[in-house]
Amino acid sequence: MVDYTDIKILNLLKENSRVQWKDIGKEIHMTGQAVANRIRKLEAEGIIRAYTILLDEMKLGKSHLAFITIFMKTNEHSRFLDFIVTKDSVVEAHKISGEGCYILKVFLESQEQLNNLLNEILIFGNYRLNLSVNKVKG
């Protein structure tokens, strides 16, 4: 069971997963060891699954962010899933309900790369493209 203190710890870790336990403890009025015990419990329960980094794709030269909704031609999805795993530009892929089968979040360096990816996707089905013009949260 997660309590209010656990939520505060999780929120601090979401801001910076490299923060030291003693610094979290100062923030929430606990010892570093008590924070460590709570974090280990959250890890053991699978609530904390991994510690990772967030990249600024724009600073890496990938200035085109697009969301692509995929409408599969057939129900043979395994080839498509194998395909997207090989694409570094696909940073997220979700199977969705409603309109479409999948939605992809892609970062690309150029319009040409986007066109090439879209042409490859046509092998599997049609798509709807949405380009991000401004990030408002996250």
Where are these regions (language model features)?
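A compositional/biophysical signature of low hydrophobicity enriched in polar/charged and small residues
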Residues: M1-G138
